[in-house]
Amino acid sequence: MVRFGVDLGGTKIELVALDHNGKEVFRKRVPTPKVYQATLTTIVNLVQEAESHLNVIGSVGVGIPGVISPFTGLVKNANSTWINGQPLDKDLSRLLEREVRVANDANCFAVSEATDGAAAGMGLVFGVIIGTGCGGGIANNGKVHGGGNGIGGEWGHNPLPWMNKSEFQSTQCFCGSHDCIETYVSGTGFVRDFNQSTGLELTSGVEIMDLFRQGAEPAKQALERYCDRLARSLAHLINILDPEAIVLGGGMSNIDEIYPQVQQLLNKYVLGGECKTKFLKNQFGCSSGVRGAAWLWAKD
């Protein structure tokens, strides 16, 4: 059996084909058209090209930067705005003449890492994607848990837990709320915190980590604050979901110094003072989402 996964991004649409062992046997990437009908055509053409190349008909899963509303059956909350309000799964199923499964891209990330990635074989896995924003997804026994409202995993838009006096800044999040986790533990939040504490105007976490590795004390303090905030935020997740593993993706996942610090701090913040949940770096990097889309058709 061949599984096709499609990642519908804002600038590119990517397809991969996985064989029955999860080995990649085909990949192609094309620019994303900014029109709904053209997006449908592009996805259909990619699937048909892959099937022609491999001489096989396969299952199709699609990851999107939004969700299918369980109430209306239409896409919502997508930053690729031209797919909002559209019955994407139904339209693709009709055009490809088979059921097409569609899920949030963060959920696809979680499914990928839970199926054959960093958390392979674990039951309940939370996938965390931290870059310019802060998203998440839940895989339960290798399958998406979207929840009754279709927003399962949106941990970044809860308030930062156990805030201290210096953190009560009433920082507004793009979602309209204040002091969301995302405003502190996103890559953007990491840079803003460093700049506010130093008066500098750096533009990326890479610059901060370069200073850290040169022994700069302000960078060391910024990373300590960041890891403490991330550990507090993840501890809330663990207290509620108690996952076997949390897998980190996105740009911040490339900072290797984060993992041991956060793993140790979880013992401080998780109820009971002991945490067995593993905090892991992703295995498949930027390919994890598209692989997870393919794995929406899980192994039987």
PLM feature segments, named:
Residues 102-106:
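Short loop/edge segments at beta-strand edges and connector loops
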